[in-house]
Design a protein with these regions (language model features):
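Membrane-interface "cap" regions at the ends of multi-pass membrane proteins
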Residues: 2-73, 224-231, 249-257, 473-487
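Juxtamembrane transmembrane-helix boundary signature
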Residues: 79-112, 121-137, 467-474
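Hydrophobic transmembrane alpha-helices that form the core helical bundles
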Residues: 117-153, 315-332
Length: 487
């Protein structure tokens, strides 16, 4: 296939770099296409890739938060299951990775255009990812500092910085080594982390009040407000992972889409539901306003350092994926750096934000606020992506997606696919109007006493808009057009 002529933007920097994807070696490939000769693995390996990050301390925190908000135990568990169903969407967009053989931040040029995609990826693939890096590193650092206090080390800003930098350094190292190392390492981490968190769960179950009811049961509209807010908090996790194509792109092109979807979704769904549920059970008797202290109160002393190390290891696993994809996102928006250097830059930014967060913000408040508000952006963007996959029947030409010239089939009008951009903006605007949180209540939400409909409005609205606007702008994806490749 002939490539289009170069423009000042030109093809991506690394578009013809040789690949190397072996565990224990630094991955040399960036966003460039993975040729069929270098494809390997099975969809089953995606289970541990997504399980390790979700055997998580934050799951306990979120589960406890639902009960603290005033939900009953049964309602909390129902919200946990419902919100985590969005992992199916994360799994679904992963099918585009093997189809195109490149990262999701490049594939999304089909939705937003060569130029428009830069702005979208800068926001969702870089800025929001950096915020999540800081959030997770903050959680692990709080746990790590608790361990240093038990060891008798005096608390100080210098010690805070050392703990953060050690955790961040381990995370960035995983991201630098890249895909094959992540796949191999996360299989072992899934087993180890599951053993530790299952042991903790058994301890929590021994203190659970199975007949728990809130002291002041919620009724009427106030009840719906808390239910929708809790649902938003839980669903924000799967809706933030638009990077799933990055981890599936090395799979053979013929890998079944259903297998990719289910192994990805199940890997994240199962531990998320189980351990978020355990967090809710813990809150029936423990004071989860201070989740670390609450959980440590049911542990034998010897288990506390094991728990803290597991929290740190899980954070490394979680943020390892985020940092890995953030490096690819930087390349896709035109930052001409090797993948390894791009990951280092992301790590420095995330570390700086973490230190600021530890010194300035209350951790639990920051978790709730971010998880309630981030879906305003991530929900519509992920839905536009999923809708494009449906409309194109998952047929993407990775080589054409790397062409950034004005003759690129993804140049659209002035480099922007206005159907995708307006659909994402429209969905985000609708979600903003209907969002309700501690820090922000949109006019629609405020008129309904804080009812949070950001997710259904943002998700359904952006999907409908993208389909309608694609026809209106004449960019409706055609499976027989030269912009696609038959599989």
């Amino acid at each position: 296939m002939q490539r289009s002529p170069r423009s000042p933007a030109g093809p991506d920097v690394a578009a013809s770099a040789p690949g190397r994807d072996r565990a224990g070696l630094v991955e040399s490939r960036g966003i460039d296409c993975v040729p069929d000769s270098e494809r390997h693995g099975t969809a089953r390996e995606l289970f541990s890739v997504w399980a390790a990050p979700n055997v998580s301390y934050l799951s306990f925190v979120v589960g406890g938060t639902l009960v603290l908000m005033g939900l009953s135990l049964a309602e909390s568990l129902a919200v946990i299951v419902a919100g985590n169903l969005f992992w199916l969407l994360t799994g679904f967009i992963a099918v585009s990775g093997p189809a195109a053989g490149t990262s999701g931040s490049v594939i999304s040029r089909a939705m937003y255009g060569v130029v428009g995609n830069k702005a979208v990826v800068a926001l969702t693939g870089w800025l929001i990812s950096s915020l999540y890096l800081a959030l997770n590193w903050s959680a692990a650092s709080v746990a790590g500092l608790g361990l240093t206090a038990r060891l008798g080390l005096p608390d100080s800003p210098a010690l805070d910085a050392v703990v953060v930098c050690v955790i961040a350094g381990a995370t960035i190292l995983v991201a630098i080594y890249g895909h094959a190392t992540i796949v191999r390492l996360y299989t072992a981490l899934t087993i180890v982390l599951t053993l530790v968190f299952v042991a903790l769960s058994v301890m929590v179950l021994g203190h659970t009040n199975w007949s728990y009811t809130p002291a002041e049961p919620l009724t009427g509209l106030a009840h719906l407000v808390v239910l929708t807010s809790g649902f938003t908090i839980v669903a924000s996790a799967p809706l933030s992972y638009s990077n799933s194509p990055d981890l599936s792109r090395y799979l053979p092109r013929h890998t079944r889409g259903r297998a990719i979807t289910l192994w990805t979704a199940c890997g994240a769904f199962l531990p998320s539901v189980v351990f978020t549920g355990i967090g809710a059970l813990a809150a029936t008797t423990l004071d989860m306003n201070d989740p670390q202290a609450a959980l440590e109160s049911v542990m034998p002393h010897w288990f506390v350092p094991v728990f803290v190390v597991a929290v740190v290891v899980n954070t490394v696993a979680n943020n390892g994926l985020t940092a890995y994809s953030s490096g690819l996102s930087m390349q896709s928006i035109g930052v001409r750096l090797p993948r390894m250097i791009a990951v280092l830059v992301v790590g420095v930014i995330g570390t700086t934000m973490t230190l600021f967060a530890l010194l300035v913000f209350d951790f639990l408040t920051a978790v709730n606020a971010m998880m309630e508000l981030v879906v305003i952006v991530t929900g519509p963007c992920m839905t536009v992506y999923a809708t494009d996959i449906v409309l194109r029947r998952n047929r993407y030409d990775g080589e054409l997606l790397h062409d950034q010239s004005r003759t690129s089939p993804f140049w659209y009008r002035g480099g922007v696919n206005w159907a995708g951009v307006l659909a994402a903006l429209g969905g985000a605007a609708g979600a903003t109007l209907c969002a309700g949180s501690t820090f922000w209540a949109g006019p629609v939400s405020a008129a309904m006493d804080g009812l949070n409909l950001a997710i259904p409005v943002g998700v359904l609205g952006s999907a409908a808009l993208y389909r309608v606007l694609s026809r209106a702008f004449g960019t409706f994806p055609s499976t027989s057009s030269p912009t696609t490749t038959q599989r």
